[in-house]
Amino acid sequence: MRVRLAAIEPLNLKVFDFDYDLTFQVMFLSPDEKVYSRYGGRCEQGPDARQSLAGLRFTMESVLAEHRSRSPRFAPRETGKPFFIADIAPPRGLGRCIHCHQAKEVIYDRMDREGKWNLDMAFRYPPPDNLGFVLDVDRSNVVKDVDRGSPATDAGVQPGDQITVLNCVPVHSFGDAGFALDRAPKRGSITVSWFRGDREMSGKITLPDRWRRTDISWRPSLQGLVASPRVFGEDLTAQEREEHGLTATQLAFWQKSKVPSQAAKAGIRPGDLILGFDNQTLEMDAYRFLLYVRSKYVTGETVKVNLIRNGRRLNLPMTLE
């Protein structure tokens, strides 16, 4: 039976546990509120970059097959007393429509006041791309691409494999994969199972440092955390790059004459030759660097600004705001 829910207030969030920054989410439930699957997802490329009607149909058929199996599998969920957004929403928020992303803001605000918030929470529901495999939009749990040398490659995953379980969560869709990775530890490894043709296979994916990091600039609930590099200017010419011993494609730009207060406080001066942050050689121009910082860092983090001044290389610590 299909039910359209347009408000989050009456929902038990222990059941309807998903990425609340999304504009569209489908939950496949059993009559006793066990979760078969979650369909929905997005990224910085746009609200529909990770979903399609064909993908929804594929997931529906996959879930129906699961439902008809002898031992249907369900996603893990928190049990116990139901939890509603009204339990923690401020009184002024009640009696009005609360959007899903606002529910997330209320939850995060409460955690912050209780001292439970940390920056890792900004990177919830990381996509499988972060571990090196991309799911097909129209065939929701089928691997489209695998990055060479990635954790997914090391685990044995190949394009065309059909992911069935990730971190103990049944996978029918991109949304299921995100839910599975949201539950994954900060470091260590997670299990993954897949079908390659008729063969059932499995492996372990090792979680690298900062593996959760992804672009949060599209998330309504996290706009206050989107960082700015606070340095910007004109890219070096080919001749200037040659004079400074730099490659033709690596990040290198002259800091413009107006230096923002945060950068000035860190010691950045007009005319500094900026090479990037944290000793990473980045293949991009100054504009792409702006987008890179927005996707990889959050406000409050301290970075080391790598620059050249009068022929000397310097690394100046700066807190992003």
Give residue ranges: language-model regions.
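Thiol-based oxidoreductase modules, predominantly thioredoxin-like and allied folds used
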Residues: 1-11
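Sequence context surrounding c-type heme c attachment/ligation sites in exported
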Residues: 1-3, 42, 46-132, 137
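Structural micro-motif
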Residues: 18-27, 272
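A short, hydrophobic beta-strand/beta-hairpin element that forms part of a small beta-sheet core
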Residues: 23-42
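PDZ/PDZ-like peptide-tail recognition elements
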Residues: 95-145, 204-256, 315-321
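Terminal peptide-recognition signature
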Residues: 133, 152, 160, 192, ...
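Conserved PDZ fold ligand-binding element
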Residues: 152-175, 263-286
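PDZ-domain C-terminal substructure recognizer with occasional recognition of PDZ-binding tails
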Residues: 164, 179-217, 269, 275, ...
